[in-house]
Amino acid sequence: MSRKMAKFYKLDINRTEWEIPETYQNLQPVGQGAYGQVCKAVVRGTSTKVAIKKLARPFQSAVHAKRTYRELRLLKHMDHENVIGLLDVFHPGQPADSLDQFQQVYMVTHLMDADLNNIIRTQKLSDDHVQFLVYQILRGLKYIHSAGVIHRDLKPSNIAVNEDCELRILDFGLARPAESEMTGYVATRWYRAPEIMLNWMHYNQTADIWSVGCIMAELLTGRTLFPGTDHIHQLNLIMEVLGTPADEFMSRISSESARNYIRSLPVMPRRNFRDIFRGANPLAIDLLEKMLELDADKRITAEQALAHPYMEKYHDPTDEQTAALYDQSFEENELPVEKWREMVFSEVTAFKPTAAFAELLPKEQ
């Protein structure tokens, strides 16, 4: 929010001071994590609800500052119905165009009613529901992948849904390869492609498709498909379903310890997916088999999955947009915290809301 006339007010939320423009009213906390606190709010004079995230210590270190820059750049780049995007960004420092006063970053995004976790836990989904939800995930993924971005951490809690069953993918691309393990966060492992989880080999965008397969299986059955308690247990559960990998695939696993471990196990046959997903639509089972493919090079892509017969009811190639390529060259840079802060400041002050959201904002801003 580079609008210099904005009046800010302060309030205390869970022992954290928030300082936000009067544009945003009725703040209520909805979540808190290592990287920030999230509140829902109403745009003054409208019924529009938004989510506001206050980043925790955005410039505490060069690592924090680079993460802040990454999140802001990614959100700014994304403009798609099935992907969370940036509605507004602001900082309370005055004067607004002074880098010296720039210490806090607040990001405004769409407010969603629930995530897939809530939905899986509270209702039995029809096949049509599953089709529509998976279609939207794939439609959003096609867009994200076309930008050259890999999500890396797709799971039910990162997929938001509103009461009309409209879906958006959250928190994409924030886990870089170097920090992608998130030790101790069990639920992440359950949906993570084996090639990422076990550092088997170079991974590509189909790592996200594995995650969609795990999510789709859970939508169909109401149960987590591979609820591993650790990496080894996770791998065992996967092989109990998919069978022991072929020798040709094994030869491409770069981790010798992983190869030796798999070879030490009894040979496991592949289970029939029709037995695991009894009563499921045969087309759903066929798509699942193409998503839950151990070999990332043979795994179906988002674009191919959208054209699968299971998606026929919703598939419309003219309405499945692609994105401009996202410039990730900054990832190579190791810069001091002040330089990252300056770059974040430039992004914040240059931000322009979409025309639709700008219409809702007070005109003096």
From Swiss-Prot:
Pfam families: Pkinase. The gene is p38b. It is found in: Nucleus. InterPro entries: Kinase-like_dom_sf, MAP_kinase, MAP_kinase_CS, MAPK_p38-like, Prot_kinase_dom, Protein_kinase_ATP_BS. Belongs to the protein kinase superfamily. CMGC Ser/Thr protein kinase family. MAP kinase subfamily. SUPFAM superfamilies: Protein kinase-like (PK-like). Gene3D superfamilies: Phosphorylase Kinase, domain 1, Transferase(Phosphotransferase) domain 1. Residues 24-311 form the Protein kinase domain. Coiled coil: none annotated. Its cofactor is Mg(2+). It comes from Drosophila melanogaster. ATP binds at V30, G31, Q32, G33, A34, Y35, G36, Q37, V38, K53. Keywords: ATP-binding, Kinase, Nucleotide-binding, Nucleus, Phosphoprotein, Serine/threonine-protein kinase, Transferase. This is Mitogen-activated protein kinase p38b. At mid-embryogenesis, highest expression is seen in developing anterior and posterior midguts. Almost ubiquitous expression throughout all development.
